[in-house]
Amino acid sequence: MAIYHLSMKIISRSSGYSAVASAAYRSGSLMLDERTGLTHDYTRKSGVAEAVILTPATAPAWCTNRAELWNAVEKAECRKNSQLAREIELAIPRELPQDAARETVLAFVRENFVSQGMIADVAFHHMDKTNPHAHIMLTTRAVGPAGFGGKVRDWNDRTHAETWRASWADHANRALANAGYQEEIDHRSYERQGLEKTPGIHLGKS
């Protein structure tokens, strides 16, 4: 049975996170963090099916290189409490064929984030098992031919969260219908749907 799960968080330096380390972990890559000098090697991490970088038309070509991208993000942030990236984690209906699941996630990302100027680093995990999901790391600064500019504060508007959550449900439900399934997922809580049910437990990140 398809379930709905979409969570959001900020990857911040004050919480001890590194954008480079986070991207390396999610993509199953080996990356050098030029700011700290640390090498993060997650090439033996299991479950990583694919990692894809999507960029807006304004982004220079080097932004499709994962190491260059996230090291540039680190260099653009000088404060100890800098917000480095936004992450969205979403569950993918396991009923969907892998190709359809992949394209559904990428279409959702293009429509909601890349079209607004964000760069998205999308990692697909456990696509052949019972917990297929995607991690989406998003940049927080405007990007142009010369690289990163100022922070785009509008992207932090809390009203976007509801829009993004509803959009994922719409994309997933269209894909389920195209695959011949009648069931749908709903981004609203059981309480908002008027249902007396106990929420399911998402298996969590991996």
Which residues are covered by each model-predicted region?
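N-terminal nicking endonuclease/strand-transfer module with a His-rich metal-binding environment
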Residues: M1-S206
